[in-house]
Design a protein with these regions (language model features):
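A conserved beta-strand element that flanks and buttresses the S-adenosyl-L-methionine
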Residues: 92
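Conserved alpha-helix/loop element of class I SAM-dependent methyltransferases that forms part
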Residues: 10-28
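A short glycine-rich, Lys/Arg-flanked "PGG" loop and its adjoining helix->strand segment in the class I
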Residues: 105-116
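Short catalytic micro-motifs in class I SAM-dependent methyltransferases
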Residues: 95-96
Length: 200
């Protein structure tokens, strides 16, 4: 059995800090959607007392359960699992939304699960469709080479899929479903989406 690297790094882990930085003060509950190996959920647990990770893949959840017992691990589809609406102060997702078939229905579901005053924080993948997107891709390639040489690339066990939506599609859908959301293109082929649910 191979030893785990001293520092786990890949494109998704690189942006966990973007999620942790927007956890609301006093947050008590968090949901990690598409938790996979559970790395983000375990980091959230350092800031939030009650963390739930949900994923439809039983195999990747086995790895998560082995590493952390102080998180509630659920096997299921976030779109249909009977989670209590408006019950999470943080709803986070990294590299998951593009796996789900209906982007706007997914964003609506995440908003439904978010408590008033709570935050949705997404790091997602999308397709490049504009010149500016391709410029980010070039910058991301250079950054990847530098960071991969420094840390190596940790391969997660969760399945992967190409993103069906463009960055423009995601930005427009977020504006429709989550008014006031902030959207930002990131290097390393990712975007960040953050939204705070109104309190009334």
């Amino acid at each position: 059995m191979e030893d785990e690297p001293a520092v786990r790094w890949n494109h998704n882990i690189h942006y966990h800090r973007h999620i942790l930085d927007v956890v609301p003060d006093g947050a008590r509950t968090a949901l990690d959607v598409g938790t996979g190996d559970g790395l983000l959920a375990m980091e959230l647990r350092e800031f939030v007392p009650q963390v739930t990770g949900i994923d439809p893949d039983a195999q990747v959840l086995k790895s998560a359960r082995r590493q952390q017992s102080d998180v509630t691990w659920l096997e299921g589809d976030v779109m249909t699992y009977p989670l209590t609406p408006a019950s999470f102060d943080v709803v986070a997702s990294v590299a998951t939304i593009h796996h789900l078939p209906d982007l706007e229905a997914t964003l609506t579901r995440l908003a439904e699960l978010t408590a008033p005053g709570g935050t949705i924080a997404v790091i997602g993948l999308a397709r490049s469709s504009r010149l500016l997107d391709h410029a980010y891709d070039i910058g991301g390639f250079i950054q990847h080479q530098r960071l991969a040489r420094r840390f190596g690339v940790w391969e997660h066990s969760a399945p992967t899929a190409p993103p069906p939506h463009s960055y423009t599609d995601v930005r427009r859908s977020a504006a429709r479903v989550l008014p006031g959301a902030t959207w930002r293109r990131l290097p390393l082929w990712r975007y960040a989406l953050v939204w705070t649910k109104p309190t009334r």
